[in-house]
Design a protein with these regions (language model features):
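WD40-repeat beta-propeller superdomains and closely related acidic/aromatic-rich repeat-like regions
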Residues: 1-339
């Protein structure tokens, strides 16, 4: 990978754009996930598109309206819609309705656990259904902004206004509250289970060290952070929201406390979405002008995957072994890169 300094034109970056298989989906995309050899592009409305290695497209209807959220564990893509349904689609394209809100409220957030459990939210209520089919719910102080399962144990983090709630659905007792003023819109546990980080409505992140609830202020962004991704092994948390990829260090016992983040792949426009390679210290970053870069985190070396002059990048994902990258912009122009 070659290096380009701040503002160094795209012509100075080594290009692998000729290795991308273009895919025209013809409709907006909100996220992309891999199920076996297929890239599954989640549309903004009603359906998902399965795209094979050759770029052939097959559509699967999943919702009777807008798709508001989606996650995947590599076995299924689970989505929530404004039709009040939580829907799963598997690698064979089989669709199953997992839950329907009794009041047909919008499903704002979904999360998946490794043992088959899943969570979803409608309004102020978070629901968990275990792998054995047992369902529990918890009401939090305000509308749920994000959900995430801890990497160990059945523990759910629920982001909301003025903080986050940590809930063990299988245990009695009061859930733990982590407070921080402002609206929290996304949430993630560090892979080692030691830290919790929320993305805020304002241009900042906020973190807590779970052992002692110590605060970690992660500010200085010019725009809201809409995308967060942990690097292989959880050493860094890469984020969008600035005119470079901001990567916060989490390898030490104090995480990013008292440390400056790395600033990778600077461009004159903001990063909109980030995705970390599952096995190596490499990330992919998409930008407002349609650029996609692959970045080596060790030294900032860059490869150009997609040139500028396109709509903002909306979705990025690696497959399980990191041999393929899928992307799409806000208008549905997509691509597959084989490495």
């Amino acid at each position: 990978m070659s290096q380009a300094g701040p503002g160094g034109g795209q012509a100075s970056i080594a290009s692998i754009t000729d290795r991308v298989t273009p895919v025209s989906l013809g409709a907006p995309v909100s996220s992309v996930h891999f199920l076996r050899d297929n890239a599954v592009f989640v549309g903004a409305e009603e359906s998902v598109a399965f795209v094979d290695k050759a770029g052939e497209i097959g559509r699967v209807a999943t919702h009777g309206g807008g798709i508001l959220c989606a996650v995947s564990d590599g076995k299924r893509v689970v989505s929530g819609g404004d039709d009040g349904k939580v829907v799963a689609v598997d690698a064979e394209g089989e669709v199953a309705v997992l839950a329907t809100d009794a009041k047909r409220r919008w499903i704002d957030c979904v999360a998946l656990h490794g043992d088959g459990a899943f969570a979803w939210s409608a309004g102020k209520t978070a629901f968990v259904r275990s792998g054995k089919g047992e369902e529990k719910s918890l009401e939090v102080p305000s509308t749920v902004g994000g959900l995430a399962f801890a990497p160990k144990g059945l523990r759910l983090a629920i982001a909301h206004y003025n903080g986050a709630t940590l809930w063990f659905p299988n245990m009695t007792g009061t859930p733990e509250s982590l407070t921080w003023a402002g609206s929290q819109l996304g949430v993630t546990f560090s892979p080692d289970n030691r830290f919790l980080v929320t993305a805020m409505h304002e241009p900042a992140l906020h973190g807590w060290r779970l052992a002692d609830s110590r605060h970690m202020r992660m500010s200085g962004y010019p725009g809201r952070v809409r995308s967060m991704a942990w690097s292989a092994g959880g050493k860094f948390l890469a984020t969008s929201g600035a005119d470079s990829v901001i990567a916060w260090p989490f390898a030490s016992k104090d995480g990013p406390m008292g440390k400056e983040p790395a600033m990778l792949a600077p461009l004159p426009v903001r990063a909109t979405v980030v995705a970390c390679h599952p096995k190596q210290d490499i990330l992919a970053a998409g930008y407002e002008d349609g650029t996609i870069l692959m970045v080596r985190m060790e030294d900032g070396g860059e490869l150009l995957v997609r040139r500028n002059g396109n709509p903002p990048v909306a979705a990025l994902a690696w497959n399980a072994d990191g041999s393929r990258l899928a992307f799409a912009d806000e208008q549905g122009d997509a691509g597959l890169l084989a490495l």
